[in-house]
Design a protein with these regions (language model features):
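Aromatic side chains
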Residues: 32-33, 38, 115, 129, ...
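Residue-level recognition of conserved structural "scaffold" positions that shape functional pockets
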Residues: 11, 43, 89, 147, ...
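Generic secondary-structure boundary signal with a strong preference for alpha-helix termini
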Residues: 16-17, 48, 76, 152, ...
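Conserved beta-sheet core of the metallophosphoesterase superfamily
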Residues: 23, 122-166
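Conserved catalytic scaffold of divalent metal-dependent phosphoesterases
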Residues: 39-138, 142-143
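Glycine-centered flexibility sites
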Residues: 4-5, 30, 36, 82, ...
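Short charge-dense sequence patches
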Residues: 5-13, 118-122, 145-146
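Membrane-embedded segments
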Residues: 1-66
Length: 166
C-alpha cells in the first residue's frame, strides 16, 4: 500500500529507483498506489518533467500496479480506496481546510459491512478521513516527521506547522 510520493520532479531524477522498488514489491504481493502531491503536480502541470512522469506512469501500469485515482477496489469484506486531494491542500505555511463535502463528492460510497482502507497522502486530514468512513488510513507526506523528538513526535510538518498531530 503506497500513499504517494514515490517520485519527485527534478531534472536529475530518472525514476529508476522507484521503478526498481515497485518491481520488487510486485513480486511479493499486489501493489496499490495512490498519488501524493509530487505525482499530482507532475501529472497536471505542464513542465519539462511531465513527459518523464507519463513514461513512469506507463511503466507502473505495465507492472500491474493498481493505481487508485479516487477509486476503490473491493475484495469481499475489504475495500482499498486511493484519494487525491487538491494541490491547494499542500500550501506551505498555511493550514488549508479540506472542503467539507470533498470526500463525499470525490470518493465512491463505501458500505458499513466493508473494512475500508484508505490511501490518503496528507495526514493533516485524518479526522476527515475517519468521518468519511475509513477504518484504516495509510498516509505519507510527512516523511516520518521532518524532525522527530522521542516521546513527543514530529516537531514540524511540511506545511511548517509546529507539533503536528499526524
Amino acid at each position: 500500500l503506497i500513499p504517494g510520493d514515490m517520485v519527485v520532479s527534478r531534472k536529475s531524477d530518472t525514476y529508476e529507483t522507484a521503478l526498481k522498488i515497485l518491481e520488487e514489491l510486485c513480486r511479493i504481493a499486489p501493489v496499490y498506489y495512490s498519488y501524493g502531491n509530487h505525482e499530482s503536480r507532475a501529472h497536471i502541470r505542464k513542465s519539462e518533467y511531465q513527459e518523464k512522469f507519463f513514461a513512469f506512469e506507463n511503466k507502473v501500469k505495465e507492472l500491474g500496479i493498481h493505481v487508485l485515482h479516487n477509486e476503490t477496489e473491493a475484495f469481499g469484506e475489504l475495500a482499498v480506496t486511493g484519494l487525491e486531494i487538491p494541490l491547494s491542500c499542500y500550501k506551505k505555511g498555511v493550514d488549508v481546510p479540506l472542503p467539507q463535502d470533498y470526500l463525499e463528492k470525490t470518493l465512491p460510497e463505501q458500505t458499513e459491512d466493508t473494512f475500508q482502507v484508505l490511501l490518503a497522502h496528507n495526514p493533516r486530514y485524518a479526522k476527515e478521513y475517519a468521518d468519511w468512513g475509513a477504518d484504516l488510513t495509510f498516509c505519507g507526506h510527512n516523511h516520518g516527521g521532518l524532525i522527530r523528538i522521542p516521546g513527543v513526535g514530529s516537531l514540524i510538518s511540511p506545511q511548517f506547522q509546529w507539533f503536528p498531530k499526524y
